[in-house]
Amino acid sequence: MIANSESFLAVDIGNTHAHFGIINQRKILDQWSVPTSSLGDDLSLWSWQDKLKGKKLSGCCYCSVAPSVNKVFERHLSKIVKKIHHLNCRNIKGIKIQYPKPEEIGQDRLANAVAAKNLYGCPAIVIDMGTAVTFDILSAEGYYEGGIIAPGLSLMTHYLNEKTELLPKIPASEIEVPASVIGKSTVAAMKVGCGLGYAGMIESMLKAVLEELRNSSQEKVSVTLTGGDAGKLLQSNLRVYDYEKSLTLLGLAIEFEHQDLTMVL
């Protein structure tokens, strides 16, 4: 854990939104999101810089899947904090990677794996439900082994609308696991198909991964759900697993502890 009580900044830069969190002792004190495009635009910077005014921050740890904004973001961030750590597969310390092409692993997925290992133990599975659904698997020894990438809920709903003439566009926010599996209208039928199909896809993939892990280890497997759509599945069979909305930010917090020499683990 952290030897001092200074807060620091964690930032998860995604394709559409960047998520900010001010963290102290692995507790998130404040968090907010801004469009990722604003990080690479000098005219839009104040939308996130204003939130940091007056904050005493020991540094920043961030991950990014939008490399085009990183340079401008770091340039302006360096005026606020002096210690900036950009998490990637080459400098990560919170986990060990056993993967043929580690540079292909999304940095947010690495942060999730760090959080899962340290908060829930290994072997571990992290299921992140965003634009895409990703599974990240850690062995009993704590090695990052690989995972699964599948379509997310918003891709399902958009694809039905884009590839047909008569099916309407339904926001992913309106989809949930249905009480009845018989839709009484086109929209209701689509909601059943997407909601039930989404949950079924994830449950099926999870079952297969659990079976493979249990064949290689007798230890209990921790399963953690995160991502914008994870809350929708708390009504399904997945409700028995851990749910952490801010898993990526917490993973960045733990990685910052490993990287910062002024902290004691």
Give, region by region, the residue ranges found by the protein language model.
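N-terminal glycine/serine-rich phosphate-binding loop of ATP-dependent small-molecule kinases
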Residues: 1-93, 265
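Gly/Thr-rich phosphate-binding beta-strand-loop-beta motif of the actin/hexokinase/Hsp70
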Residues: 1-29, 116, 122-144, 160, ...
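Adenine-nucleotide phosphate-binding core of ATP-dependent small-molecule kinases
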Residues: 32, 176-219, 240-242
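Short hydrophobic alpha-helix segments
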Residues: 32-34, 148, 253
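Short beta-strand-loop/turn "lid" adjacent to the catalytic site in phosphate-handling enzymes
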Residues: 50-105, 141-153, 184-195, 199, ...
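Phosphate-binding/catalytic loop of phosphoryl-transfer enzymes
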Residues: 83-85, 91-164, 195-210
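A polyampholytic, Gly/Pro-enriched intrinsically disordered region
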Residues: 103-114, 168-173, 178, 261-265
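Glycine-rich phosphate-binding/hydrolytic loop that grips phosphoryl groups
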Residues: 165, 235, 241-265
